[in-house]
Structure formats: structure tokens, C-alpha cells
């Protein structure tokens, strides 16, 4: 079986299929999707994945972001009603359509801080709010890999903190990084910037100072 962490923008299903195939993983093996948070570029292709899969895929997310993913509440960062006329006018028509008609899908199971999923030799859920209220990061115990989501980014191969422009609560987001310090991490995967190898804990410690 296979699991997928986040689903990209709307319309990226074929890219997901191709990437899985290149990694030697059939799309037909996909049994679970874990969402790190509610942002459009993380939940975008979820409805397409669920529609195209022959499996009963389980969707996981934190309870704080669940109503936004399910469409009960508008996405916090792309709600047209919260944008100025100037901001709205500057958007391409395609983005206006997406903001007015965001993807939505049912969350089957909500995740809690410290919870462990049995996939991949054990995945520990780390509640890392700030970027969004229900942001989570995932620690794959067997491979000592941290999937940070948007809690951190990688720029020019260097691990950096959350991006202020897209983070709803920067103080909370920085505080959330402290959760990583007690973990034995060898590799960090960030949604923006990709993979970073951790050679010493100072790389993480410097981000919370």
C-alpha cells in the first residue's frame, strides 16, 4: 500500500500519478492521504484523487483545519470576502475561480499531537500551528525523516523558518519549531524547497532563537 502526504494544487493528479510511477509506486496502491494543512496548494488535487481512485482512501488532517478542508468554512488565506478590491483585481481569472470554488473533500479521521500512525514503520503526528491553526508535521521514525509541511522551508539548500507572508501567526509558528528539537532527525522534507540533510542539531536550534 501507499500513502500520500498533501496533494498539490488543483489539476495536478496526472503529475502525482507520474511521480508515483517514477518512484515505482502504482497509484492503485494509494490507501491514505495525510494533509499537513488547509492551504490550496496542499489540498488542491484531493477531490480528483478520491474521484479517480478505486480504493476507499482514508483522509487524515488535524481537527482545527478540518472544517476548511471540508468546505464548511472558507479557506483562511484565499477567502475572497477577506481580500481588498486591489488584491482581488490583481488575481488572474483562473485564481479568482479557484478562490471562489475551492476544492473540498471529507476528512475521515482527525489527528492529534503525539498520535502515531502505523504506516511506514510509524509516523508520529507533531502539532505545529502557526502557518495555519491546524498545521501538522510528520516524523517518520524508521527513516528519521521529518516532513515539515510549511512549518519550515528550504532555500538554496539551507533550512529556514516559516515564511512570514504566508504564515497566519508567526509567533506561534516559531514556537512550534521547538517541537522538533527532541527528535532524532536526519532528513527534513519541506513542501517548499524540498529535501535537506541535518548534519547537526544547530541547524534547527538556530531557527528558534
Enumerate the language-model features and the residues they cover.
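Active-site metal-binding loops of divalent metal-dependent hydrolases
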Residues: 7-9, 38, 63-65, 130-132, ...
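Short glycine-enriched, charge-decorated loop/helix-capping segments at active-site entrances
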Residues: 159-166
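Histidine-centered catalytic micro-motifs
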Residues: 33-43, 127-135, 189-195
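Conserved beta-strand hairpin/beta-sheet module of binuclear metal-dependent hydrolase folds
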Residues: 1-23, 137-149, 154
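Active-site HxH/HxHxD metal-binding segment of metal-dependent hydrolases
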Residues: 12-13, 21-109
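Core dinuclear metal-dependent hydrolase active-site scaffold
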Residues: 110-140
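Residue-level marker for buried hydrophobic side chains located in beta-strands
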Residues: 3-5, 34, 59, 145-147, ...
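Divalent-metal (often Zn2+) His-rich catalytic cores of metallo-beta-lactamase-fold enzymes
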Residues: 48, 52-55, 116, 139, ...
Amino acid at each position: 500500500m501507499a500513502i500520500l502526504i498533501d496533494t498539490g494544487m488543483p489539476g495536478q493528479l496526472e503529475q502525482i500519478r507520474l511521480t508515483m510511477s517514477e518512484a515505482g509506486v502504482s497509484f492503485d496502491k494509494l490507501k491514505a492521504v495525510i494533509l499537513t494543512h488547509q492551504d490550496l496548494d496542499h489540498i488542491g488535487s484531493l477531490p480528483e484523487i478520491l474521484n479517480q481512485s478505486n480504493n476507499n482512501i482514508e483522509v487524515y488532517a488535524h481537527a482545527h483545519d478540518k472544517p476548511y478542508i471540508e468546505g464548511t468554512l472558507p479557506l483562511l488565506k484565499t477567502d475572497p470576502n477577506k481580500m481588498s478590491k486591489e488584491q482581488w483585481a490583481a488575481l488572474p481569472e483562473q485564481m479568482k475561480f479557484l478562490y471562489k470554488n475551492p476544492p473540498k473533500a471529507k476528512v475521515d479521521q482527525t489527528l492529534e499531537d503525539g498520535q502515531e500512525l502505523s504506516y511506514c514503520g510509524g509516523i508520529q503526528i507533531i502539532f505545529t500551528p502557526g502557518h495555519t491553526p491546524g498545521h501538522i508535521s510528520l516524523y517518520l521514525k524508521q527513516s528519521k525523516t521529518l516532513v515539515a509541511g510549511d512549518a519550515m522551508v528550504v532555500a538554496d539548500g539551507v533550512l529556514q523558518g516559516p515564511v512570514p507572508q504566508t504564515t497566519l501567526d508567526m509567533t506561534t509558528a516559531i514556537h512550534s519549531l521547538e517541537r522538533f528539537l527532541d527528535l532524532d532527525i536526519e532528513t527534513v522534507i519541506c513542501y517548499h524547497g524540498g529535501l535537506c540533510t541535518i548534519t547537526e542539531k544547530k541547524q534547527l536550534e538556530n531557527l528558534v532563537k
